[in-house]
Amino acid sequence: MHRKRYLFFDIDGTLVAGGYEHGYVPDSASLALDKLRKAGHFLCLCTGRSEALAVSYMHQMGFENMISDGGYGITIDGKLLGIQPLPKDKVIRLVRECEEKGFSWGIQPDNSDTRLAPNGRFEAITHDRYMKTKVQPGLDPEAFEEIYKAYIACFPGEEEQIGTLRDLPWCRFHQEYIFIEPSDKSYGIKKVLELMGADLSDAVVFGDSKNDLSMFHDPWTKVAMGNAIPELKELADYITANAEDDGIYKACEELNLF
């Protein structure tokens, strides 16, 4: 009988190989998930994606539990318990500065697969395929009760011109723009463990990129993929193979999880 563990998996570059546009779940990763379930472990996706964009992965891979929105959204047994928004006043200040300095922007005021932008410039600059962009002339962030994410079109280095960014969490996944979104997966993991009545030492986390760094500082088992960034590998307890080279399966086998 295996000790019950609480396993938290990043999606892109961890469970899913092949990059954003050609992503696939390796057969060995699917097999590992099946064996982990049969061993009685608690499985949970842990992603920076919004719940609306990640829920299809959750169903596709047979998960019932998910931390979304960079640690601020929690789904247990298929039910979304809630999503904590960004501090609205700080987002408004960011948007105003971007307007003054000529940076195109978009916001996500609800849990959906669509961002709103005041004009077509954001899409023209980014040619983004990550999510839909709907143009809403006269868009004003003050008109919305909550804002979950924001997006600024800027190339690497240009973000240094935007002082209000210092007050908000942000990440860059694409050359053309940055995401202003929560980036504290550790926060979500601790919330889930608390709900489950589990200890921090019962958790095992799997990740590969910058937005996984927050979950690599706590006293639980930390697994970095072979394709992970160097900073993550330095914090890991175990470094496995690349996502496309059976990294998930090999790590679970090595850690005697099944």
Predicted features along the sequence, with ranges:
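Hydrophobic "anchor" residues on beta-strands that sit immediately upstream
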Residues: 6, 65, 198, 204, ...
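Conserved acidic, metal-coordinating active-site core of Asp-based
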Residues: 97, 101-104, 108-218, 227
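Short, structured coil segments at secondary-structure junctions
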Residues: 61-62, 70, 164-167, 218-219, ...
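Short, well-ordered alpha-helical microsegments
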Residues: 51-55, 158-159, 212-213, 232
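Asp-based, Mg2+/Mn2+-dependent phosphohydrolase catalytic module
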Residues: 218, 222-223, 228-258
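Active-site phosphate-binding/coordination module
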Residues: 24-122
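Asp-based phosphoryl-transfer active-site loop
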Residues: 3-21, 45, 216
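Short hydrophobic/aromatic-enriched beta-strand-loop microsegments
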Residues: 63-71, 127, 171-172, 222-226, ...
